[in-house]
From Swiss-Prot:
Keywords from the named record: Cytoplasm, Exonuclease, Hydrolase, Nuclease
Protein name: Exodeoxyribonuclease 7 large subunit
Catalytic reaction annotation: Exonucleolytic cleavage in either 5'- to 3'- or 3'- to 5'-direction to yield nucleoside 5'-phosphates
InterPro entries per UniProt: Exonuc_VII_L, Exonuc_VII_lsu_C, OB-fold_nuc-bd_dom
PANTHER family named in the record: EXODEOXYRIBONUCLEASE 7 LARGE SUBUNIT
Organism of origin: Salmonella typhimurium (strain LT2 / SGSC1412 / ATCC 700720)
Amino acid sequence: MLSSQTSSIFTVSRLNQTVRLLLEQEMGQVWISGEISNFTQPASGHWYFTLKDDTAQVRCAMFRNSNRRVTFRPQHGQQVLVRANITLYEPRGDYQIIAESMQPAGEGLLQQKYEQLKAKLQAEGLFDQQHKQPLPSPAHCVGVITSKTGAALHDILHVLKRRDPSLPVIIYPTAVQGDDAPGQIVRAIELANARGECDVLIVGRGGGSLEDLWSFNDERVARAIFASRIPVVSAVGHETDVTIADFVADLRAPTPSAAAEIVSRNQQELLRQIQSAQQRLGMAMDYYLANRSRRFTQIFHRLQQQHPQLRLARQQTALERLRQRMGFALEARIKQANQRQQCVSQRLSQQNPQPRIHRAQSRIQQLEYRLTENIRSRLSEQRERFGNAVTHLEAVSPLATLARGYTVSTTTDGKVLKKIKQVKAGDIMTTRLEDGWLESEVKSVTPGT
């Protein structure tokens, strides 16, 4: 009987070897959770310990080249998650596991799920920059998806009220923690998209542990954010908290308060920009008028240096054209300033900062009135100077001298007769009077005494 079954008889060594190969080949690498006990670390640097639960235990070894990658010091009674290979120690026939990695259970398990989902969604392209939607600038209505009783909502509303009190805010209250939270967050995102009331959404909550923030690592929430037609700003926890929602969102804010800062405009800054624009407009007008005044002065000096009537008439015509161009340019600038002011007023009216806008408009009107009066005064002054110049030029004109009874006599070769030695008896000379010329013959020359 024994002789017929000798081929099935194992030695102890062969049995242990066969069992080891079966365990290693069939089981492969597995994840095991349990409580650490009997932890030791000899001089070799290897770790030896037992993993147990309420009803069973198994011996474990973790060699030095693997345990040096563990980021914490295992303690007796600590719950851990171990990735290990199943094997058999042949000399004693002891079944054991060889650990390759170790992490705390609870958060460690969640971290593993987090990494797996992150890798999956990244492979699908949900994190790609090409899918990110730009945020509206400025936002006309902000939707907030968070708990209606949490500190995050209070922080968001406080920042929005401080920066842009006229900005409409719609709250879509949801749970942000617990088993029902992911579904509620998804429904809130879908509702906001269906109603189309907002042009940007803030999705988030305050800080907490990994378990507290786990709703924002849910695949359903990630896909709802990715599918949203409205740009989404994630604002989950603190700056060091990074969730799957942060990777999928169009923009990640480090905190809920920072998200409110991002989607809102600072009205104080807007008013400073308006005041700066007014100042630049005033400086431009002053420069324009000063430049035209210098040009007018140059023309006036040139008129003084040239002979009167014909050139004076041409310059007067050119001056009139210049005045008209100045008037047209001024009207165009004022019209442009009015248009800009109306545009700014219209934009501000949508944000409802009425008292400040009224004050700004009143200031602009005062500046326009003062500018117009200043230009009129300068034009009147220049006209007066121009009239005085004409009067002066007419006073020194040779024609005016003739009109007072004086005459100018010239010899036959056209030279002006200044002394008697230029003529002699019998010479012919021409005399210019106010209304014409006469020709006379010199009868005699008598020197003066």
